[in-house]
Amino acid sequence: MERIYLLLLLFLPRIRSYDVRSVTTSWGMVRGEVVSPEGDDLPPVAQYLGIPYGVAPTGQYRFNMAISAAKWTHMPKDARKVSPVCIQTDMPELSETKAFKHTSAQRFDFNHRLLPHLKKQSEDCLYMNIYVPERLEISRDNYLPVMVIVHGEEYGWGTGNAFNGTTLAAYGHIIVVTLNYRLGVFGFLGRCESSSCSGNSGISDLVSALTMLNVILPSFGGDSKSVTLAGWGSGASLVSLLMASPLTQPGRRLFRRAILLDGSALSPWAISQNPQQYFMQLAEELACAPKNRTSSFNDNVDTIVRCMQVHSSENITKAVLKIDVPTFLSGFAPIVDGQLIPNKPQVSFSTQYGSLFREIDLLVGISSNPSHHMISNEDLKVGISKEKRMRIFRSLVRNLYDFHREEILASIINEYTDWENPRDHPKSIRNGVLNALSDVLYTAPLIETLRSHSADEVRKEANTFMFAFAHETRSWSQEQPNSGIRGSLSGDIVPYIFGYPLAQGDSEERLYSGFNTDDKGISKVMMHYVSNFVKSGDPSKPNPMSKNFPMGDVFHSTAWPQFDQPNREAYLEITDRPRVKNYYRNAQVGFWNNFIPQLHKNGKETEPVGEEHHLLSDHFRKDSYFGKTRHFSSYANLPFPPPPMPPSPPPELTTKPKPSESPTTLQTTTESEKAAAGSFTGKALGGVIFIGCGFLIMNVCLLIAVRREWGKKRRNEKKFQLQYQTYNSNHGGGAEQYNSLNSPEPLLSASHKNSTSMRPAGISPTCPRHGRAALALQNSRGNSLTAAQAPTLEEIQV
């Protein structure tokens, strides 16, 4: 027994020297471990799990902005276990019977696989995981680019711990970082006072993590100047918001590139439309505000927040479940606060104000059916009736629009009806509903994001690429071969980017499983393109596609152009037969981005009509809707006018001129963008211009009047001065004696001022009659009169 123990002691240091890796950073030393990725003889990867980047947001720090983590220089940090996940406030239904009434079988299966990763929850959850491929040596010349993953699905649940970055790091030869950030009410408790809003603490977590990474990445062999931020679903929305956030540019940008998968801040669900309503409802449920309030706004916001900070996380989570959020919208989500989110995304992404947004390299990926998880499993199998389609579309119109609802509803039904199949088969109707929800909630906003980023009005150095992921994972599909649903489903892109199909065998414990040989080839293609983009901002560079695997030969010969007007909005369709196509779902995108906004805009600008004109038929019948509807109110989509945009960097620092294009290529600003920007600035700008012009006219008139009075006074002064000079020269008065208009008028001759006898008449030149008579008499006498001979006042008066 002693020999065995001695042998273990002998070999243990050798094993640990291979398994353990220590890295010294400015925050302190961290100890991770080396693991071998599954499949294809990939190099080992050192993983450092559970590295803190923020102070535990509890007590007085709850609901507030993130604070950087304290340093641990006194002792090494053990980084071999993942941290607890953040509090999950809006978990999906886990009962199969109930879940299948609201979601697909594929999403239900994924939720169950994710559940084990969500069991250990805590508010102390601001941690990240770093995956570094092993190399022989590290120097400044071979620092690795970095990809930071922002997990998605929804704002209320999820974790970065569940996604293993070892395969992607080893295959792509990049550093992969996953992290946790506050979710739901803990990360997005929006509240508004009389003139400002706050509540984007979850986004501040991401900024805090990026700030720390920019400092410590060189210690891990990472390039802090080559960071890519990637996200899907709600995570993609957060990434796009950070692209336009001034807080990501303290000195230089905290990240250089971005990847958006099935999500954008332009989606209707991306921004909370009425945060104060949810804030006050939560305050009532927690007894932090009276229930008999008459207004959604309260001057004691700080007092209410302090009351909420005292409650336990369990109480808050239970209270959130009692708050109804309209279907297709988000309750506790990012808000426009003027700091992290300076303005509405439609404005921040525009060509006029989007200089920060447009200087980031962008790669966008869209699945074939991004709203697949929003259709119930039964409806996906057998189809949807016309009556249910009407309820779904009525809820969509009521929750997303305020004006001309009947006209918008009729337009949507007309657009997504298969007129070539007049029988209205339930599966045909299902396909129309699936396409409509995918287009309005995902596809159209993403295309609008791409167009704003690639607009040619002010050409920039950043690249813009798009791919449509159409590969089908056949083993996941529960549909029959003739179901009519083709292509990828919501969430399908993620496992292919992380390299899950390369794992050997299937396991129920894995987050994803059930892949075949074709799936493995597509996964290699996706990891190659993504790692290339992380390195250079171009999916095709710097490394060409390898031909050493079945799919590689096909993709090697396929060029991938940029998404812009000169290339006719080109994108790469990723299937086993890749093709470059143009104008992705252009007719449907035009319907949602141009026609519907114009129809809705006319309702705002036309003559006032009765409010009932904009209501749907049977507007208040609850059974005529699907899910939860927005309450009847006239509130605007933003509680207050957003603050003005911060100053943009000088154009010459962020953009470069481009040779002139034809007028058709320069026309990239869509009507929806103009409507969004116009609706925001039109009335306010018009009022400012009107008032400014009024003040300008008043000032000009006042200036003219003052100028005229001053000129008149000057002319009189000159006239008086001339008359005084003539008078003094004729009567012996020196100019030095009477050269001031402020002196008393001279009535007596200065030479006789001490005489008591009758003096010569001193005629004031200001006398219109006597002054002229005196001058005429003087001229007739040849100017030879002495003082004694001068005419008396009586002589002149006769």
Swiss-Prot record:
Parts of the chain on the Extracellular side: 18-685
Here the segments flagged for biased composition (Low complexity) are: 653-665
Annotated GO biological processes are: chemical synaptic transmission; modulation of chemical synaptic transmission; negative regulation of neurotransmitter secretion; neuron cell-cell adhesion; postsynaptic membrane assembly; presynaptic membrane assembly; synaptic vesicle endocytosis
Q: Which SUPFAM superfamilies match?
A: alpha/beta-Hydrolases (SSF53474)
Q: Does the keyword Membrane apply?
A: yes
Q: Which UniProt keywords apply?
A: Cell adhesion, Cell membrane, Disulfide bond, Glycoprotein, Membrane, Signal, Synapse, Transmembrane, Transmembrane helix
User: What InterPro entries does this protein map onto?
Assistant: AB_hydrolase_fold, CarbesteraseB, Neuroligin/BSAL
In this chain, composition skew of type Pro residues spans 639-652
Q: Where are the transmembrane segments?
A: 686-706
Q: Name the source's superkingdom.
A: Eukaryota
Signal peptide range equals 1-17
* Record localization: Cell membrane; Synapse
The record's region (Disordered) falls at 636-676, 731-765
* Membrane-topology descriptor: Single-pass type I membrane protein
Q: Name one GO molecular function term.
A: signaling receptor activity
What Gene Ontology cellular component terms go with this record? Answer: axon; cell surface; dendrite; plasma membrane; presynapse; synapse
Q: Does the keyword Disulfide bond apply?
A: yes
* Cytoplasmic compartment segments: 707-798
Per UniProt, subunit arrangement is: Interacts (via extracellular domain) with isoform b of madd-4; the interaction is required for the localization to postsynaptic domains. Interacts with unc-49.
Q: To which protein family does this belong?
A: Belongs to the type-B carboxylesterase/lipase family.
Task: Supply the name of the protein.
Answer: Neuroligin-1
Q: What is the organism of origin for this protein?
A: Caenorhabditis elegans
